[in-house]
């Protein structure tokens, strides 16, 4: 599935509140490239942008929890110069530096209204 495929997904659910968790993509802080380049901050933003389009079409959503907030040590992640023993799906790098996706998520939280499920 491509990130833009999420734009057209339709959800039909009963009147129940929904929390969406563990979504997003990996990116190494400071690694830049095209919106389709794996591990680039731009690719992480692109994935989130399309996921937000889908999420905004689900009126019952009451909360969003990204895959992880901050990159963390994960011994099985061994791609040299990209993972170096870290899970890189965070909005913040392991040293606390904000990735581009942090600002996108911050904006999404500010714009999203919360109320009763319809």
Model-derived segments and their meaning:
Residues 2-118:
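Substrate-binding clefts and catalytic carboxylate motifs of secreted carbohydrate-active enzymes
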């Amino acid at each position: 599935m491509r990130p833009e495929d999420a734009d057209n997904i339709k959800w039909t659910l009963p009147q129940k509140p929904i929390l969406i968790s563990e979504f997003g993509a990996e990116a190494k802080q400071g690694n830049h490239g095209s919106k389709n380049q794996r591990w680039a901050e731009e690719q992480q933003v692109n994935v989130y942008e399309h996921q937000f389009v889908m999420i905004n079409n689900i009126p019952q959503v009451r909360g969003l929890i990204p895959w992880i907030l901050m990159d963390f040590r994960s011994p099985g992640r061994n791609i040299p110069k990209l993972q170096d023993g870290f899970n890189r799906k965070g909005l913040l790098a392991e040293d606390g530096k904000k990735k581009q996706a942090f600002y996108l998520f911050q904006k999404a939280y500010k714009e999203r209204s919360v109320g009763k499920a319809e």
